[in-house]
């Protein structure tokens, strides 16, 4: 062994020389006395310190320093160095708040001797190391740089943090008029007397639900835009929450993907960085606002109307349920069931009126922003029709009949108790805001601002309702600019609206007007052909609290008709439409009104309204497969045709219970309809196919079906392919630029013909061109 070899090697050394020991001989903990053989101990003969004395046998070297304290050899050893434990610098570890900036530095695990060869684990294939040397500190410095920055994302949208929200001078310098506070539980409404506020209570957590409030935010952004205002959207630092809402808006408004919208916002505000949960929700939102085809797992979606946050219990939003089935319904609430064939609003027997109203508004938002083309039906607990349960069974085959046997009013889901309790206390006046506004620190009752989101929906609804009652005598235009809404002229007494809504017409997305025959969500204009297929999107949130019930009209459209025609309503002379987006950009001249379309782009005639007030709202499903926003209606009750076409758009119309008359028309003594030739209005008593002259325009009132069982009539305007306006220009409004037959608004002419023929003003008008499909008209003529 080493210690023994050293001792033996020193036997031949000259007397008086130092005895050298290896440190390992004294520090070897593995060597024990029992391991040394007895023969070895006898062979260890070490010379004595006195050179003249004989050799003597010495005991073996001590095992440890502690076992031999007085040895001279121990004194000869170099002093032992203390063990060095190096502590890592504090800067190399993550600091508090690193998760707030979105990046975690990844320091190596503390190790011993770095110069020696050690086993290393290569994680390059599984984890990408942060290569930016300034990742943590620079990120915080960057946030500090944007602390006082009011970042402009769009003409009317600015993004920032709390530091800007509390600085009135910065807000004023940027022309801010409205503020959306995303962190109501942290930041109060600092300058409520100077700006219009709305608040959300969003946690910067991946589990926070932002999908349910996106459409309310879209409404707010559009409301600000129509007022030519500017809105400042802020959270604490302007990094995650506020930027997520703006990204979602750009995805809908501009038709951008999530990546494009995110990069656009990030170019305006370099620290924009939605958390992972928000990003996932925005990717799901992208599929909806771009009208992507539904996946098999998304065929059935069910929403429960509930408060978005306990801080604002009257802000009701549709929250997506994880288990969509009849067992998820609760008699205390309102639910939205979205199927490929229809959208149902299920109202429980104990549901409050406020919740039912907001559910109807939420459905209109879904139809508008997601471009839903399905009928919308309201069913009440206990009165569910059979087709309602059949719709469930078609998606969930395992649903049995036992679901229907639940007693009406007894449906209850315990998981909803907290939401309903919060909401019930709020409507009973038991809710007091946790954070008083800056200019009133003594609020002891529920302030109006706590329900501001519902009031915004009512604002759109009231304006839309006024338009409907006004149009009962003069139909609205079916071809809209990107604003899609019609504004009353200043001279019309019935056009009085609030000051906040008269600045400009309501503003809808240009992407909400798209080609009906294309799966692409973006709009498609065709200037070369002089016509395009435009499908108006659903109107803004509609909430009409004065109406008490909703019913569904049966479809009166034949399969051919549902695939075929599409006419256009003429705007009232007392109304004007805002210029379209294409016109404002200068890329499209003239009106986007397209009276003459191919057969594939035509639809059934537009609806008309009864002038008197009504107590019912009817979701009419007739003739809107190709984008008719306002289909016709004779208001014949609430019976439902189970064979309704799947793709139809909602149309909200009013009709009186006491005025459900049948549309009539003039006939001769033999019962044959009286036709006339336009513009001379020459009556044609014996109508036949021979009278369909290529150089004439013939107005023909005919039954809506071949057998005439429905009793309703349509006014068909047959336009010959050789008809010319050369001698009839005076009969066409010169303001409409009707230089050709294609540019004539034949629906307006049809309304004039209705008056001259003493036909009901609500008679649907259909345009039939000789150069296009005439199958329906010829079939009706042959049946006479």
Swiss-Prot record:
It holds the Pfam family MPK1_gelsolin_C. It catalyses: O-phospho-L-tyrosyl-[protein] + H2O = L-tyrosyl-[protein] + phosphate. Gene3D superfamilies: Protein tyrosine phosphatase superfamily (3.90.190.10), Severin (3.40.20.10). Substrate binds at residues 235-241. Phosphorylated on threonine and serine residues by MPK6. Changing residue 235 to S: Loss of activity. Residues 1-73, 94-118, 488-586 are annotated as: Disordered. SMART domains: DSPc (SM00195). One of its GO terms (molecular function) is MAP kinase tyrosine/serine/threonine phosphatase activity. Its EC number is 3.1.3.48. SUPFAM superfamilies: (Phosphotyrosine protein) phosphatases II, Actin depolymerizing proteins. The keyword Hydrolase applies. Transmembrane segments: none annotated. Residues 22-34, 489-510, 521-553 have a biased composition (Low complexity). The observed mkp1 phenotype in Col ecotype is largely due to the Col-specific TIR-NB-LRR receptor-like protein SNC1, which is absent in Ws ecotype. This is Protein-tyrosine-phosphatase MKP1. The lineage of its organism: Eukaryota, Viridiplantae, Streptophyta, Embryophyta, Tracheophyta.
